[in-house]
UniProtKB/Swiss-Prot annotation:
GO terms for biological process: gluconeogenesis; glyceraldehyde-3-phosphate biosynthetic process; glycerol catabolic process; glycolytic process. Its EC number is 5.3.1.1. Pfam families: TIM. This is Triosephosphate isomerase. Transmembrane segments: none annotated. Signal peptide: none annotated. The lineage of its organism: Bacteria, Bacillati, Actinomycetota, Actinomycetes, Mycobacteriales. One of its GO terms (molecular function) is triose-phosphate isomerase activity.
Length: 261
C-alpha cells in the first residue's frame, strides 16, 4: 500500500500567537499548493496559538493542517490545567501528539496513560501521533527493538484493530531529540519495520500496512530524504527545524519528492 508522507512540526513550548501567525504564513508562502497532493503537512503549536492558527488557515484556505501537543484523557471536569479533546476538535485540530518522550520524562506519563489519551483522541475524531522510543542506554545494550515493541503494545492497549488503523506512530529515539544526533537511516528503518510487524500482530497485516510510521529526532532538510526513502518510514515528527519556515517548507518539499515542476 502506498502511504502518503506526513511531515509534522512540533513547536514544543515556543512562539506566542503573533509569532505563530508569522511562521504559518512563511510556510504557506514557501510551499506551493501542488506539494500538498504529495505530502501531508501539519503544525503542532502550543495551545495558546491554536485559535490564531485556525483563523489564518481557515481565512486563507491553506492546505496545511494543525494539531496539538497533548490532551487530557478526560473530557471535562475538575482537572485544572488540562485540555479536553473536545476543545481541540472544536478548534479544528486534525492531529494530537500523545506520549512524547518529554511528557513521559518530565510528567511521568506511562504507557497506560498514553493509551487512554489515544483512545480519547480517537473518540473526538482526532488522529493521535503516538510516540515511542528508547533512551541511549537501552540502545547501547542492544534492547532497543524489544523496548519499542513493548512500549508500542502498552501505548495501544485497549484499542481495537479498527482504532489502531486510525493512529500515527512516531519513533523518536530519546537520545536523538534536540541533540543534533540522528539515528542512521538503517537504524531508524530497523525499528520502524519492527513497529509495523508488531502492528500486524496487534491488528492485521492490512492495517499495519496502512498506518503511517514517522521518525522523530533531529530531522532536518539534510537528512529527511534518506530517512523517508526507507520502506517503513513515512515522514517525520520535526522539532527544531519546524521553527524555521523556509527549512520546514524545504523539508516538506523533499518529502513530497520535490522540487516539483
Amino acid at each position: 500500500m502506498s502511504r502518503k508522507p506526513l511531515i509534522a512540526g512540533n513547536w514544543k513550548m515556543n512562539l506566542n500567537h503573533f509569532e505563530a501567525i508569522a511562521l504559518v504564513q512563511k510556510i504557506a508562502f514557501a510551499l506551493p499548493d501542488k506539494y500538498y497532493d504529495k505530502v501531508d503537512v501539519t503544525v503542532l503549536p502550543p495551545f495558546t496559538d491554536l485559535r490564531s492558527v485556525q483563523t489564518l488557515v481557515d481565512g486563507d484556505k491553506l492546505r496545511l493542517s494543525y494539531g496539538a501537543q497533548d490532551l487530557s484523557q478526560h473530557d471535562s471536569g475538575a482537572y485544572t490545567g488540562d485540555i479536553s479533546g473536545a476543545f481541540l476538535a472544536k478548534l479544528g485540530c486534525t492531529f494530537v501528539v500523545v506520549g512524547h518522550s518529554e511528557r513521559r520524562t518530565y510528567h511521568n506519563e506511562d504507557d497506560a496513560l498514553v493509551a487512554a489519551k489515544a483512545a480519547t483522541a480517537l473518540k473526538h475524531e482526532l488522529t493521535p501521533i503516538i510516540c515511542i522510543g528508547e533512551h541511549l542506554e537501552v540502545r547501547e545494550a542492544g534492547n532497543h527493538v524489544i523496548h519499542c515493541e513493548e512500549q508500542l503494545r502498552g501505548s495501544l492497549a485497549g484499542l481495537s484493530a479498527e482504532q489502531i488503523g486510525k493512529v500515527v506512530i512516531a519513533y523518536e529515539p530519546v537520545w536523538a531529540i534536540g541533540t543534533g544526533r540522528v539515528a542512521s537511516a538503517s537504524d531508524a528503518q530497523e525499528v520502524c519495520a519492527a513497529i509495523r510487524k508488531e502492528l500486524a500482530s496487534l491488528a492485521s497485516a492490512q492495517i499495519a500496512d496502512s498506518v503511517r510510521v514517522l521518525y522523530g529526532g533531529s530531522v532536518n532538510a539534510k537528512n529527511v530524504g534518506e530517512l523517508i526513502a526507507q520502506d517503513d518510514i513515512d515522514g517525520g515528527l520535526v522539532g527544531g527545524a519546524s521553527l524555521d519556515g523556509e527549512q520546514f517548507a524545504t523539508l516538506a518539499a523533499i518529502a513530497a519528492g520535490g522540487p516539483l515542476p
